[in-house]
């Protein structure tokens, strides 16, 4: 990869690190374990809230978003060829909390340089990082 591009990406990450962490924390705070299906929330209230928050974050970054009947959603950035897509598939639901947590699993924290909380690595954190990567592309490419 171009060294100049690496430096630009590093600068973008440094400039946006605190907001990125806040966005991950906001998603982690949503208990998105599958719940009882109800009108407008086929997987329960928690997964619906996480979907809504994710689409809100994407829209705030200037991406076009679509909620597909509350089952899933997506954000997109128009490209030169509308027939071609690059997709990053993530999810924002989590499995039930198991034993061994020594702190609230829905309150993200940083410990010894690690992010801890339900979904930080599977898959809420990667979802937010993906949105920031697309946002960087949107802001920097012609």
Q: Which ranges hold each PLM region?
A:
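Residue-level signal for well-ordered alpha-helical scaffold segments within enzymatic catalytic domains
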Residues: 26, 132-136
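Conserved small/polar residues in nucleotide/adenosyl-binding loops
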Residues: 137-142
């Amino acid at each position: 990869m171009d060294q100049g591009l690496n430096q630009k990406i590093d600068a973008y990450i440094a400039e946006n690190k605190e907001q990125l962490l806040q966005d991950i924390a906001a998603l982690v705070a949503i208990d998105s374990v599958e719940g009882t299906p109800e009108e407008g929330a086929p997987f329960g209230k928690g997964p619906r809230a996480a979907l809504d928050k994710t689409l809100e974050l994407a829209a705030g970054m200037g991406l076009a978003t679509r909620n597909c009947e509350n089952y899933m959603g997506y954000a997109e950035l128009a490209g030169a060829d509308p027939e071609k897509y690059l997709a990053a598939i993530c999810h924002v639901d989590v499995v039930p909390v198991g034993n061994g947590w020594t702190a609230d699993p829905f309150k993200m924290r940083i410990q010894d340089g690690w992010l801890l909380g339900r979904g930080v690595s599977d898959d809420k954190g990667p979802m937010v990082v993906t949105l920031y990567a697309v946002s960087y592309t949107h802001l920097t490419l012609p």
